[in-house]
Amino acid sequence: MEKKTVAALSFLFIVLFVAQEIAVTEAKTCENLSDSFKGPCIPDGNCNKHCKEKEHLLSGRCRDDFRCWCTRNC
């Protein structure tokens, strides 16, 4: 009987642990116009590098308006 109880508790613990790991969700992100990027934005990675290194944000991308937009957590 004791082995069955230990096995059942172990199984329950594993199920709860897996359920907790699945419940983790991704943070929402927002885009803002870069505060300090100068010049036209062309898709060569400068905007992304600028947003990460100078503004300490998640990423950056050039949009159709040739301006640099940085991505941050909302």
Swiss-Prot record:
> Could you name the Gene Ontology cellular component terms for this entry?
extracellular region
What CDD domains does this protein's entry cite?
Knot1
- Ranges in coiled-coil conformation: none
| Major localization listed first in the record, in broad terms | secreted
The record's Pfam families line, in alphabetical order, gives:
Gamma-thionin (PF00304)
Q: Which PANTHER family match?
A: DEFENSIN, DEFENSIN-LIKE PROTEIN 1
Please state which protein family the record places this protein in: Belongs to the DEFL family.
Name of this protein: Defensin Lc-def
